[in-house]
């Protein structure tokens, strides 16, 4: 079931959307036209999921150059949804825009609820009768900003969706089911069955230390869900155009003006029976170029999108030099340790430029580019777009492959035999055991005798060895260490 939230600008649609979804997904600001594209969220209640669509404010009299596209996006959401919420400002009474929207929505013959928002006081509630003239019989007064009567709206939605209310017994059963079972726990390879790096036997103290650490490093099984892919880049490089070209529909509003996209827009798409969620983000700009609070919130949400995505697609403009902002985004992606692909958009404008020479030169411009996959594409001409899916799938397969503990130990044991650690104060680094701890982020855990015996050059040597052995050139990964506790002196 899908619910579309519609209304003229600045009536509190995004505030209501955030309340229903119980997350701050949409930017809320007193500036009209803050929301432009369709935003998707979820109501998770009654052991069910209801999809919610937030839309931009519809005002046919507005001179905003985006208004036509906002209007089209809102009507598309109304067609897509099975239940409609028309949001009005109870303090303003019925406006011409409210009347026009009601006339548009009533003929759709879908359940339609009039949400009289901003009913913050008893005096506001006395104006309910004014809205009977819209011809909508299902009416609820709310205050999204103060969380008033949202429960009544949710109950009405439940009734329309015909979702039964779970009994007390069923709720208790659900809570018990959420507890992890012994069968669901993921156990590591038994410590006793693995070959240690050195032939010398462990002391009882070392064996107890290692066995306890291994028991604490169980890794949860991967979640079966759509792959999240965020398109990141500075304004006006064509992020929204790429999504529209991939989906073959005008899903995101595009314009030549930087800053057109403000919210992070999640767009679900299925390709070759694989599910993806593309996250269209606002362009990151230099701090001094951010002119208002809406742009500041958009930029902060771009960083949040990087933190929650599985793979980043950094979009750059082929006609421009790699900018300071591009390099800043690359460092941000590296900081969050996200696998990434670089999309060089607007390649149709690069007349007479050899692609391989361009890619070689691009790799020299920033160390964070490294061995990242680089695709030269054209959203306008739909050139090389299908390569995006293969690049995403290839890197995600590597990034989510759980490596065998036995294989990790053999690779590191071989590395230590080829190049022994240096002796420091009469002692040498020992690696007792190693595991592939997690895939998100990709992390190896090494159990060692002492952190003080691990030098930076040797750590880099181990990291390069693992990178080559497991083809991790395009997957950021970390090495973590657990050192044996120092002996207590008597």
Curated annotation (Swiss-Prot):
Keywords: GTP-binding, Nucleotide-binding, Repeat, Ribosome biogenesis. One of its GO terms (biological process) is ribosome biogenesis. The keyword GTP-binding applies. Residues 401-485 form the KH-like domain. InterPro entries: G_ENGA, GTP-bd, GTPase_Der, KH_dom-like, KH_dom-like_a/b, P-loop_NTPase, Small_GTP-bd. GO terms for molecular function: GTP binding; ribosome binding. Gene3D superfamilies: 3.30.300.20, P-loop containing nucleotide triphosphate hydrolases. SUPFAM superfamilies: P-loop containing nucleoside triphosphate hydrolases, Probable GTPase Der, C-terminal domain. Residues 1-165, 227-400 form the EngA-type G domain. The keyword Repeat applies. GTP 2 binds at residues 233-240, 280-284, 345-348. Belongs to the TRAFAC class TrmE-Era-EngA-EngB-Septin-like GTPase superfamily. EngA (Der) GTPase family. GTPase that plays an essential role in the late steps of ribosome biogenesis. Associates with the 50S ribosomal subunit. NCBIfam families: GTPase_EngA, small_GTP. This is GTPase Der. It comes from Chlamydia trachomatis serovar D (strain ATCC VR-885 / DSM 19411 / UW-3/Cx). The gene is der.
């Amino acid at each position: 079931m899908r619910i579309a939230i519609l209304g003229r600008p600045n009536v509190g649609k995004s505030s209501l959307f955030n309340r229903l979804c119980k997350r701050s997904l949409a930017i809320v600001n007193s500036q009209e036209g803050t929301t432009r594209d369709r935003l998707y969220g979820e109501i998770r209640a009654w052991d069910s999921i209801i999809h919610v669509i937030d839309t931009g404010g519809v005002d046919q009299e507005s001179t905003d150059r985006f208004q036509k596209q906002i209007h089209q996006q809102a009507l598309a959401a109304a067609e897509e949804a099975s239940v409609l919420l028309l949001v009005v400002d109870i303090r303003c009474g019925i406006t011409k825009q409210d009347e026009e929207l009601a006339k548009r929505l009533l003929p759709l013959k879908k359940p339609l609820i009039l949400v009289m928002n901003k009913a913050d006081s008893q005096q506001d509630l006395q104006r309910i009768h004014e809205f009977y003239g819209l011809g909508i019989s299902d009416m609820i007064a709310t205050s999204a900003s103060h969380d008033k009567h949202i429960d009544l709206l949710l109950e009405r939605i439940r009734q329309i969706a015909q979702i039964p209310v779970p009994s007390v017994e069923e709720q208790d059963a659900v809570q018990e089911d959420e507890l992890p079972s012994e069968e669901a726990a993921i156990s590591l390879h038994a410590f006793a069955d693995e070959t240690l790096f050195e032939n010398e036997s462990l002391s009882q103290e070392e064996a107890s230390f290692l066995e306890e650490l291994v028991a604490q490093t169980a890794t949860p099984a991967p979640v079966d869900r759509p792959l999240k892919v965020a398109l990141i880049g500075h304004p006006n490089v064509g992020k929204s155009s790429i999504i529209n070209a991939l989906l073959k529909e005008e899903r995101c509003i595009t314009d030549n003006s930087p800053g057109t996209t403000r919210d992070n827009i999640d767009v679900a798409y299925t390709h070759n029976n694989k599910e993806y969620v593309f996250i269209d983000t606002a362009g990151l700009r230099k701090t001094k170029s951010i002119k208002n609070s809406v742009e500041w919130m958009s930029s902060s949400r771009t960083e949040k999108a990087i933190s929650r995505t599985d793979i980043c697609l950094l979009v750059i403009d082929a006609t421009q030099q790699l900018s300071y902002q591009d390099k800043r985004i690359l460092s941000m992606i590296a900081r969050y340790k996200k696998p990434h692909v670089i999309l060089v958009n607007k390649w149709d404008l690069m007349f007479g430029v050899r692609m391989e020479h361009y890619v070689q030169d691009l790799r020299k411009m920033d160390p964070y580019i490294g061995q990242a996959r680089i695709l030269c594409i054209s959203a306008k001409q739909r050139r090389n777009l299908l390569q995006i899916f293969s690049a995403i799938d290839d890197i995600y397969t590597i990034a989510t492959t759980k490596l065998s503990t036995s294989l990790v130990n053999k690779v590191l044991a071989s590395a230590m035999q080829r190049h022994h650690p240096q002796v420091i104060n009469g002692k040498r680094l020992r690696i007792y055991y190693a595991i592939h701890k997690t895939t998100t982020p990709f992390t190896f855990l090494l159990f060692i005798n002492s952190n003080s015996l691990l030098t930076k050059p040797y750590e880099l040597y181990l990291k390069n060895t693992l990178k080559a052995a497991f083809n991790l050139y395009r997957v950021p990964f970390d090495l973590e260490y657990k050192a044996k506790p120092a002996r207590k002196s008597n």
